[in-house]
């Protein structure tokens, strides 16, 4: 059954994935993920009992966002907020590097760090969990398109 709130965001995410322009990727991904957690019981169940705070940013801080998980909900800020202390901070060279890392079938975090595409400060398991959620959302987007 179509969802009037989530489906347009999933289509926008799919358009980001199909284009070469990665700039809006982080914003679209986080917005779609937050809505999916609200309206989809399976997505909500995947974060049940999970508490985590993520900060994503570029080194120049021109692109940044914060995602907070808690109480089976997710909230998003479209800026990097370092207080209170995040569980993981991901500094990425550019939005394309972040997109490639998060949406890879087998995320090679160590390889991305060695290539200096990303720098991770905090618990790497949080990033792997986020990548899993992003891949799940990508699959939802391909089904919606």
Predicted feature residues:
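Feature captures hydrophobic
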Residues: 1-145
């Amino acid at each position: 059954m179509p969802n009037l709130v989530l489906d347009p965001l999933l289509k926008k995410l799919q358009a980001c994935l199909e284009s070469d322009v990665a700039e809006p990727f982080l914003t679209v991904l986080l917005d779609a993920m937050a809505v999916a957690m609200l309206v989809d019981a399976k997505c909500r169940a995947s974060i049940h009992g999970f508490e985590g705070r993520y900060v994503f940013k570029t080194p120049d801080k021109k692109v940044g966002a914060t995602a907070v998980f808690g109480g089976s909900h997710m909230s998003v800020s479209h800026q990097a907020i370092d207080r209170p202390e995040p569980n993981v901070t991901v500094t990425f060279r550019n939005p394309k590097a972040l997109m490639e890392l998060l949406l890879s079938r087998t995320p090679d975090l160590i390889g991305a760090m060695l290539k200096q595409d990303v720098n991770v400060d905090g618990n790497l398991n949080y990033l792997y969990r986020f990548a899993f959620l992003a891949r799940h959302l990508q699959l939802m987007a391909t089904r919606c398109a």
